[in-house]
Amino acid sequence: TFSSIQIDINKTMKPFYSVLEYFYDYGYMGVPMFFTISGYVFAYVYLNKKEKTSGRQFFINRFARLYPLHFTTLIIVTLLQITSYKFTDSFQIYFFNDIYHFFLHLFFINGWGFQDGTSFNQPIWTVSLEVIVYALFFITIPYLNKFGIKFIIILYLALLLIDKSGIQREWTDIESLLNSCAKLFYSGIFVFYL
């Protein structure tokens, strides 16, 4: 059929498709795995520690791990987009590459619903949402330490209820994605407790 031919044509147009086929076809599965593994790792590092981690230290640790790579890739992608625009009069892949969207990326808020469309290093939207989930995690550490898996089950059921209640239909994409990311993150913590 025409649609299957069109799909094959689109696949072959992707850069290095023959070598990167697996990542093109199944790469989307990495995002849920990323959130779930992050939840597990955070539980391992921060829960039931004898020494409490201060909020300041927690967020300094997060910033130190995330920001250097984020900033480096943002600069590289920006330079590549400028080069592309100079030689082809067009940006590549993501087209909202202006100063406004640069600052959204710079401050890790490009996935929070302020954007007009995809821009610069768009896959970083996952990390911009994870920053919110990190804050939620830090706030819930005392409850996780006190109630353990019971707290996760209640939190997860509340998030699931929000999903199934229809409330989410009124939400923006960011709120819906944030709910999904939180469920995946806390699923990783659930696995930690098992």
Regions found by a protein language model. Name each.
Residues K11, P15-S18, E51-G55, F59, ...:
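Juxtamembrane loop-helix boundary motifs flanking transmembrane segments in multi-pass membrane proteins
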Residues Y28-V31, Y46-T83, I93-L104, V133, ...:
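Transmembrane alpha-helical segments and their boundary/interface "anchor" motifs
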Residues I5, N48-K50, I82-S90, K146-I149, ...:
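Transmembrane helix-loop junctions in multipass membrane proteins, especially transporters and channels
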Residues M33-S38, L66-F71, L129-P142:
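Conserved beta-strand->loop/alpha-helix structural units within folded catalytic cores of enzymes
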Residues S3, V41-Y44, I76-S84, T140, ...:
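Residue-level signal for alpha-helical transmembrane segments in multi-pass membrane proteins
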Residues F34-T36, F42-A43, L47, T72-V77, ...:
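Hydrophobic alpha-helical segments of integral membrane proteins
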Residues T1-L47, Y67-H70, H105-I109, S180:
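Functionally critical transmembrane alpha-helices in membrane proteins and complexes, commonly lining
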Residues N97-L194:
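Aromatic-enriched alpha-helical transmembrane segments of multi-pass intramembrane proteins
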